[in-house]
Amino acid sequence: MKNVLIIFGKPYCSICENVSEAVEELKSEYDILHVDILSFFLKDGDSSMLGDVKRGTLIGNFAAHLSNYIVSIFKYNPQTKQMAFVDINKSLDFTKTDKSLVNLEILKSEIEKATYGVWPPVTE
């Protein structure tokens, strides 16, 4: 069973689309799940299944810890049911305007280094 990369992006965001396209190159190693963050957090979105308290906590955590990320990536281990935050910002080159803005070697390293169960995310 492969680990899963969960990509939280925004609609109509070219950087998010380019990151998603670049990460697709890792699909032989990971299952990849793309999540539209706005639809996810809408009142009737998928996050509503968590209940109001957990949903509110999740929204608060996103706002407090991930608001400076254009796109967020988590890796998920379906066997242990643990998640880890992947610091994608280290792999991005914002001078590029296509999927090459993601340095896949750096991203792979960040995915491997991401520690399960650590929250809030440790960023350098």
UniProtKB/Swiss-Prot annotation:
Keywords: Disulfide bond, Electron transport, Host cytoplasm, Redox-active center, Transport
Subcellular localization(s) per the UniProt record: Host cytoplasm
Gene3D superfamilies xrefs: Glutaredoxin
Disulfide feature: C13-C16
Induction of its expression: Expressed in the intermediate phase of the viral replicative cycle.
Gene Ontology cellular component annotations, sorted alphabetically: host cell cytoplasm
Subunit structure: Homodimer.
Function: Glutaredoxin necessary for virion morphogenesis and virus replication. Functions as a thiol-disulfide transfer protein between membrane-associated OPG128 and substrates OPG095 or OPG053. The complete pathway for formation of disulfide bonds in intracellular virion membrane proteins sequentially involves oxidation of OPG072, OPG128 and OPG088. Exhibit thioltransferase and dehydroascorbate reductase activities in vitro.
Family: Belongs to the glutaredoxin family.
Official protein name in the record: Glutaredoxin-2
Species this chain originates from: Monkeypox virus
Gene: OPG088
